[in-house]
Amino acid sequence: MPGAALLFSAIWLDVPHVVQPERGCGAASVAMVMQYWARRVPIASPPLAEIHRALYSESTKGTPASRVLALFEKHGFHAFAFEGRQQDLEEQLRQGRPVIVARKPRGSDPHYSVLTGIVSERVYVNDPALGKDIPVDGGRFEREWAAAGRWMLIAVPRQEQ
């Protein structure tokens, strides 16, 4: 629904925030999700520099989704990336799973961030460049998410599933 505002009930997850290195929004988003799960299950979260080295592609000047999936799998996670819907976001957060999303703000490259909450007509993201639990108007989020193909990624530790 182009231009439709997202309408949600209240959900929020306490996901650690990680500041991105240059061109490292993907690495920082992966680190946030790994650190979130490391608080709940005995799973190792590698250092940000190691994650960035494994993910960053010099040829694309960014982080290919295929590398994100492979890194999660290598570190003991089941990871799934797909074109999502508003209901998918809410369902995953309700199940206690932070969601990595790709957004494409007008005039800029796609940017990874971690969806941490939804309250009424706002979503909250841990943005690797801007900070923790940044409120974003639901309509703006929908436009930016749609511009990036509504891409979302869920990663769950193997022993949690």
Can you name each region flagged by the protein language model?
Residues 40-44:
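Structural helix-adjacent loops and short alpha-helical linkers that scaffold large soluble proteins
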Residues 21:
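Beta-rich catalytic cores
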Residues 1-2, 161:
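Short intrinsically disordered terminal tails
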Residues 29-33:
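Short, aromatic-enriched amphipathic alpha-helices that serve as compact interaction elements
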Residues 10-16, 34-36, 46-160:
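Conserved active-site-adjacent core of cysteine acyl-enzyme catalytic domains
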Residues 25:
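Active-site-proximal loop/helix segment associated with metal-binding centers of metalloenzymes
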Residues 2-11:
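Hydrophobic alpha-helical targeting segments used for export or membrane insertion
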